[in-house]
Amino acid sequence: MTRCDLCNETHQSHLPTLRQLYEEAFPLSERRPWSDLEQLIGAQGAYHFFLLEHPELGVVGFVTLWRFDDFYYGEHFAILPQLRNHRLGEQTLQTIREYIGHAPLYFEVEPETHSEMAGRRINYYERNGFHIVKRDYLQPPYHHDESGVPLYIMSSEQGERDFIERVCQTLVEQVYPHF
């Protein structure tokens, strides 16, 4: 099976497809405004927007990663709907793990009580070696007129409680906007 590659050069021609995927895959409360995302894409620093490319299929999705001193945070990860259930996500997680080395990787996910899809997403991450490490996490709002969103934190490592609390504090302070 051919794997997907991470491409950190997002060509302008791909942005309409990626924007549509971003806006369809994530509810408004779990995504920043597209204009803010475009600013992050062009900036240097901890934020990385990776186009997911397959040699035979072309662009299949994207993943956004934040690189911190001793861990990575996957803010958004989506595969085009027509290409889901073909193990592309699994291949992408493997590619991400190769890219980040031994650093722990964290994702936020909706609780399984939110929807059937949320439960399937948790199962997907668990099948790929992730564990729920925090169930009482409140994602700060992306928009000034909204409240935080209750989510779980999943990790590629079990981690010590103090480290997980520091991860959550880093996300609150450095990833989300402050109003």
Regions found by a protein language model. Name each.
Residues E108, R121-E146:
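Conserved catalytic-core motifs of GNAT/GCN5-like acyltransferases
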Residues E90-T92, A118-Y124:
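Charged helix-capping and loop-helix junction motifs
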Residues L51, L57-W66, F71-A78:
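Conserved beta-strand in the GNAT
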Residues I100-E116, I122:
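Conserved GNAT acetyl-CoA-binding A-motif
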Residues I79, N85-Y99:
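Conserved acetyl-CoA-binding loop-helix of GNAT-fold acetyltransferases
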Residues I41-L51, S147:
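A short helix-loop-beta-strand connector motif used in the catalytic cores of GNAT acetyltransferases and
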